[in-house]
Design a protein with these regions (language model features):
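Electrostatic cytochrome c docking/interface patches
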Residues: 20-50
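Stable alpha-helical elements in mature extracytoplasmic
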Residues: 41-44, 54, 101, 105, ...
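Inter-heme linker and motif-flanking segments adjacent to c-type heme-binding CXXCH motifs
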Residues: 1-5, 38-40, 64-68, 113-115, ...
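The canonical Cys-X-X-Cys-His
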Residues: 45, 52-62, 143, 147
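A cross-kingdom marker for long, charged
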Residues: 122-159
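Electron-transfer interface patches adjacent to heme c in soluble/periplasmic c-type cytochromes
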Residues: 72-115, 128-140
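Extended, well-folded interaction surfaces typified by the phenylalanyl-tRNA synthetase beta subunit core
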Residues: 2-22
Length: 159
């Protein structure tokens, strides 16, 4: 069991009144709207990845003001939550998961096991063990469907 950490943002990021201007510049309010050109499973997977599992928060780089760079969606993040590189999960030829089958992605998300029989480490191990392992089978299939269909983008490696 992990104890919750106290909020520890440095000044000026700890100043709550700055949220207003940030939200004006970067926040897009609204509800998830399914894409009509995609399957029901893809839409469910998109909702899980972007709204529930927050995959974008680690796997997409950040731009000005710390907002996610939507043009580099899931293309990797040079400065992840632990300070290290978070891999590109699009099907681009230079991406970490480029040769994975859908079954490989499903096993990894559910158990943390990689195709080479190694296991996820760091933050992703926690995500798998404490979150994704509890998805229903249909939600797991939907998430895999969405990830496998991501737009291929070259990896973002520069800080």
């Amino acid at each position: 069991e992990q104890k919750n950490l106290e909020h520890d943002l440095a000044v000026p990021f700890s100043w709550r009144w700055l949220n207003g201007p940030w939200k004006l510049m970067f926040f897009e309010p609204g509800v998830y709207s399914p894409r009509q050109d995609k399957s029901e499973a893809w839409n469910r997977g998109a909702y899980i990845a972007t709204a529930l599992a927050h995959c974008t928060e680690c796997h997409s780089p950040r731009g000005l003001g710390g907002a996610t760079d939507t043009g580099r969606f899931m293309a990797g993040n040079p400065v992840g939550p632990d300070g290290g590189y978070v891999p590109n999960i699009t099907p681009h030829p230079d991406a970490w998961m480029r040769d994975w089958e859908k079954a490989d992605i499903a096993v990894y998300l559910e158990t943390g096991e990689l195709p080479d029989s190694d296991y996820a480490g760091g933050a992703m191990a926690e995500v798998s063990d404490n979150g994704l392992a509890f998805l229903t089978q249909s939600d797991l299939v939907a998430l895999v469907e969405f990830i496998a269909a991501l737009k291929p983008l070259p990896s973002t490696r520069d800080r």
